[in-house]
Amino acid sequence: MTKRYWNINLEEMMEAGVHFGHGTRKWNPRMAPYISAKRKGIHITNLTRTARFFSEACDLVFDAASRGKHFLIVGTKNKAADSVASAAIKARCHYVNKKWLGGMSTNWSTTETRLHKFRDLKAEQKAGKLNRLPKRDAAMLKRQLSHLQTYLGGIKYMTGLPDIVIIVDQQEEYTALRECLTLGIPTICLIDTNCNPDLADISIPANDDAIASIRLILNKLVSAICEGRSSYIRNR
């Protein structure tokens, strides 16, 4: 994997609050190598180490995108949801930002069936077929469509399992992470001071609660993906 320069700026990360961890009582001892200090009862992440792993993650996604690989971004808590959707749309990635439905990856055949149903209902709605049904039937199908849009809207174009999954909050998205581990899908995780850095292929020590921190990390990663995609298109 070729190392590239991603303009990862320590001052910019400090301004976004990337270095602020959780309260010292909530920490995971496995995070000790990534913590530089305690301040007013919270752990402070070592941003030099963060920058190193952040750069490695950018190299990985660039390399994967330049080979035409597919990405899934997962972040369902309120503070992450909007940033996940906008970052994923910018880089033409799949995303889950409302709720990870158990078995979404490990029971892919069921997910695929739901996606087919979703696409069929969307097509019927677009063609005006739902409005020609009895009111009760139309209302039921519209509710079903709304439910599918909420939970599957970000993966509606997926035709198979992703090649790499980017996870915003390891604790919040543990079910998704566990499914990736089961299937051997490589993961990149933002890990706060209460997380286990050994569970992801690349762990980026960072504040996973601040919107500015989440947005900064995701924007850099999707910029690397976009550059990789451009390289893939040029070399086809």
Curated annotation (Swiss-Prot):
Gene3D superfamilies: Glucose-6-phosphate isomerase like protein, domain 1, Helix hairpin bin. One of its GO terms (molecular function) is structural constituent of ribosome. It comes from the Eukaryota. GO terms for cellular component: chloroplast; mitochondrial small ribosomal subunit. It is found in: Plastid, Chloroplast. The keyword Cytoplasm does not apply. Keywords: Chloroplast, Plastid, Ribonucleoprotein, Ribosomal protein. It holds the Pfam family Ribosomal_S2. The keyword Chloroplast applies. Transmembrane segments: none annotated. GO terms for biological process: translation. HAMAP family: Ribosomal_uS2_B (MF_00291_B). NCBIfam families: rpsB_bact (TIGR01011). Belongs to the universal ribosomal protein uS2 family. This is Small ribosomal subunit protein uS2c. The gene is rps2.
